[in-house]
Every structure is written in structure tokens, then in C-alpha cells.
Amino acid sequence: MPFISGRCYNPFKRKGRKTRMNLDGLLVVDKSEGMTSLDVVREIKARFSIKKAGHIGTLDPFATGVLPVVINEATKLVPFLKDDPKHYEGVLKIGEETDTDDLTGKMIRKGSGEHLSPDMIRTIFKSFIGRIRQVPPMYSAVKVNGKPLYRMARMGIEVERKEREIEIFDLQIEKIAFPMVYFKISCSKGTYIRSLARDIGREIGCGAHLVSLRRTQSGPFTIEQAIPLSKVKALQSEEALRSCLIPLKEALFDLPEMIGDDSLVRKVRYGKEMVARDLDPDTLPPFEEKQWLKMSSPEDGLVAILQSAIRRGEIGAVGPDRVVFRPIRVFQNEKTVRKEESI
């Protein structure tokens, strides 16, 4: 086979111009087993020559399910996106504890759970519902003194980890086929299901670890929206990929929306604050002081994320030059991108 070049062929690259694909949005991927969350992002970036991308939340390599991926301008949304509750379906194995708290690790403890009745197991599961303290696994991305725990774990070093408060909103056993327990859980962000499996095993008295985990929801993003990575990579056009993306404005579904006219859009794009004289109170949604709002226009879509300096009800009582909104994120649209590329 003849050598062509060291660069990968990109079917979307257009000759004669610098390519900047207008692909901005959030893609809900159904992650397959065996990949890291970063692997998913890298493959999508490479397949479509995307400049910026990232993932919201992390799934362990053995876990599957909902992994929201933000693309290009959507990377600016991450601090403002709602990412809990998290919903999972999992399988826990009673009688063995591992050093990773899942099936990929080495067994460090073995016990017999034959004395356990289904009612005893259900009672122990229920005891974990509510606000609880949890110690992250050694094999995790949590940093201690600037170093990820998993790197120290691979060197055989175990360090003390600080407990974290998390919340289990619901924990239901679906089936018990001893030693396997099939369950569903709804929890806050930052919850380690592996740690939960370990702690349940210790409470039972004979150890346990996680053998299967599938995330079915992350914040507002559900498994019904998720697309397997293989199908994403099989898409043959920019338009096909774009049709799979959740638009920026829709991803911020829970933020109050302000519609801006051309003059306000222009002002915000230059990073300027909006004062009382700029605004018609009758067109504004309710908002409190220091609240985030999204600003959009019919032509441009999402323009910016704003932070309010006062409450909506105060606008009529303040002077005309009183600052009402400050832009904290400004988004490019197709027209502004084309203008930049022509400079």
C-alpha cells in the first residue's frame, strides 16, 4: 500500500478554504464498555475534525450509558448545565471486595453471604438512602496534593481520602439472584457507585463489588436521547451530525430567557453591560439578583449568558444608568464566525 501522508483523511474538509465547521451543540452519546470518557471525545473530534470538545461527568471504562459531549461553542456551557440527578442501573456481587471496588480489580476480601435473606439485603440497601458520607475509591480521578488517586494506586500507594457528602435520592433493588443484586439508583453528582457497592458489602459483612453499571440519565439528558458512538462515527455529512446535536439554547432549558433586539445583541457581543435605559421591563422574565439568564435572538439563537445585578422588580425604581445585566459568556454564531474567517 503506497504511503500518502501522515495526516488522516477528513471527508468533511473543503478545498481552498480554512475549515471551521459550524457544529455547536451537545451530543448525548451512549458510551460502550471498554472506553474511557476521554476516548469517546477523542474519537468524535478526530472523526469530524472538531476543534473543541469535552464531556460532562465521567464514566468508568467498564460502565456504559449516557455521556453528554459538548462541541465547540457548547464547551462554554459546562459551568451552567444542570448535571444532576444521575440515574443508574447496576449489578452488585456479594461476597467479594476488590481493590478497585469493581470487577476489574484484584480480590482483597472474600466472605460468605449465605446467611443473608432477601429482606436483610433490602433493609441494608434502604439504609443508604439520604445524605451520606462517602470515601472516593483509590482508583479514581480525585486529586490529593495535585495528583490523581489512580496514579498512586497503580504504584501501590494508598493514601487517606477525605469523606464527601453525597445524596442518594432513591435506591431500589430490582432482583436478587444470589450472589448478584440488580438495582436502580438516583443520586447527586459526585456519587461513586463503586464506593457505594464497597460500603454496602462492608455493612453486609462479607464484602461486595460492582460488576455492571449503566447510566440512564445525567441531569436532563436521558438514555432515550443517547446515540451509540458507532452510529455517530458512521454519519456521512455535517448536516447529519448537526441533526443529532442539542442546540445551545435548548441545553440551557432551566435558565430564564431574555430575547434581545439587534442593538442589545450588538452591545453584548462587544462585552458591554446592559443598563436600565436599554431594557423594557415588560419583555423580561422574572429573575432575582445574581441569577443567570440566557439571552437569545430569533436570528442568532443563543447570544450570551448574563448575570443579573438587581431583581426584576427593582428596574422601575433605579436610575437609567443602573447596571441590570452583565454578560459572562458570549457565543459566536455562523455570521460572526464567517466574519472572523474573512479577516
Predicted regions and their residues:
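RNA pseudouridine synthases
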Residues: 9-227, 231, 305
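Accessory RNA 3′-end/elbow-binding domains used by RNA modification enzymes
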Residues: 2-3, 8-32, 38-59, 63, ...
